[in-house]
Amino acid sequence: MSGYRLEKRHHLSSVLENDLNKIGYHYNVINGSVAGDTSAGGLNRLKWTLSESSIEILVLCLGANDMLRGIKPDATRKNLEKIIKITLKKKIKIIFAGMIAPKSYGDNYKSAFDTMYLSLSKEYDLNYIPFLLDGVALNPDLNLNDGIHPNEKGVVVISKTILRQIKKIIK
């Protein structure tokens, strides 16, 4: 999550790093995201994203913009799978965050899109968050006026969700 229309201190990477520090985990959280980017863009940036030799965990939350652009779930899945394989080959743990397509995309698209996250998480035995925006999506108090992107309060909720997964990995 790039922190669309938020001050840097409210970006997910900043909030998550703060949350980690508060509980005694001193990690540097790198924001490798780009606003509006797709899984293909994430794959293209992966070499740069993983260029830091000290990376231990990758939080992979791509695909929502693919859906918004109507990119076929098979194409998104292929990109995500390539990202997963490259990351695991480098012995970096992955927290894989899923998304959910709205019903307005039709049953076939929704089914293919929604199930690809669970399928990949099982296939590669990943730490899995079924829906990254759980508790945030469709809540006007936790989203910007566009109704799509989380606001500062929404980012706090998302950070807590990711933090629970990180604790499982580094306990």
Regions flagged by a language model, labelled:
Residues 1-35, 45-54:
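Serine-esterase "nucleophile elbow" of acetyl-processing enzymes
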Residues 2, 38, 103:
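Flexible, glycine-rich phosphate/dinucleotide-binding loops
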Residues 7, 34-37, 71, 150:
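Short, surface-exposed alpha-helical recognition segments that flank or form part
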Residues 15-18, 22, 41-171:
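Alpha-helical cap/lid subdomain in secreted, periplasmic
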